[in-house]
């Protein structure tokens, strides 16, 4: 479903510049308990789950809780955010993470359960250092940029033993 479809659904709050890649699932049972800030990206197959159906088998009620995602947040592919979680501004959730507790602003978390790995500043410094010794590619090296066979072969060869960066 697109961001436009989401915005109209039962009071789900979504900020500006929200990007949701394919396969994401935003809890259709309790969308009004989910708030997504500005400039947020949900990578492929992210799940935002505001209820715990397993509790119903035990106590007759589903546990529910709000999910609040701050501004400038990236949530990596196949991550799951569980009920009663706040993800602070300027944070990154690594791929395949399960977020069971609040994530402070300005950190990178990863794992199951998600734990702090480093600060955003440390992450940025690490990336910048890596960029100094890695191939860097412009927009024309993407499908959207109309990459051709020659550029694909060049990129594939250059990335044989290292990673690189694309705009």
Features from the language model and the residues they span:
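Terminal amphipathic alpha-helical/low-complexity segments used for targeting or macromolecular assembly
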Residues: 1-11, 114-167
